[in-house]
Amino acid sequence: MAEATRALGYEDNHPIILFAKQEYANAEIQLQYYQTRLEEYDLFWKKRYEEYPVATEIWLFIKDQDWNDYVCAGILGNIMSEVGGGTLNIQYWLYGSSYYGICQWSKGYKNQVWGTDLETQCQFLVDTIEYELDTFGYAYKKGFDFEDFLELEDEEEVAKAFAVAYERCSRLGIPKRQSNATKAYDYFVS
């Protein structure tokens, strides 16, 4: 803008040129701020990928669904109990005599998830969660459904709701799933 006003014959001390210079300086400051933030963001996620690549991949996959951090942490807290040994070291390929994968799906889902990669399992989770919560949400709370689940704002409550309505596991393990959810929340959000 300053160059254009000079071309029109304005002096360097004209208000339009001074304004353009100030706007350019402000833009430089903002650019530097956002470049620094981007570098910090990249470093944050690089560190997480290096330390816990599978947990990070799951977190980002479910975050891409526009689910809040509490929902993501609650789901991941359950996965940590299923195939992480209570840690973020998720081993998605684990199976038992009757169960497989990040949610230890039963043989009834063999054709959909058994022997599949992480992305396929994450997509299966996303594809089935609404039906499961709409169908079995009552086990958590009367009238509870998928939309209610997405509105929860406490990772421990999300972990409990997911455990009883999606995983349908023993209630004895719920406190561990809840503490895992808090670990996941603290790791990925804090």
Which role does the model predict for each range below?
Residues M1-E3, G84:
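Catalytic cores of peptidoglycan-degrading enzymes
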Residues E23, E82, E167:
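Acidic-residue sensor for enzyme active/binding pockets
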